[in-house]
Amino acid sequence: NTWCGPCRASIKATEPLKATELKSENLVWLYIANETSPLVQYKTMIPGIQGKHFRLNEQQWRYLCDKFQIDGIPSYVLVKKDGTYELRNDLRDHDLLQKTLKEEIAR
C-alpha cells in the first residue's frame, strides 16, 4: 500500500473539510510521496484525494527533508501567503489544523 497508516488517517480526516469549512481558493493541499509508495497503488489512490500530488525520487525527497527539517511522516509544512514557511507537526492535531488554516485563510 502507499503512504503510512497515520498519513492515510490524516488524509481521511481532512478530506471532508476541504469541501466545507476549509474550502478556499487561497488554500492549496499538497501531498508528497516518495518512491517507497508503489506507483500503481499511488496512482489508484490520488484521484480520490483533493489537492496537488507529487511522487518524488530519492534525491528530491532528501532535498525536501533537508530543506524543511523533516525527520518523519506525516509532516506538515505551512506555507503562508507571503512565502514564509514553517514545519508544523503540531498540525497532526486535526482541531488545531482546522483552526490554524481558518486563521490563515482569513488573513
Model-based region annotation:
Residues N1-G5, A9:
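Active-site beta-to-alpha loop of glycosyltransferases that engages the nucleotide-sugar donor
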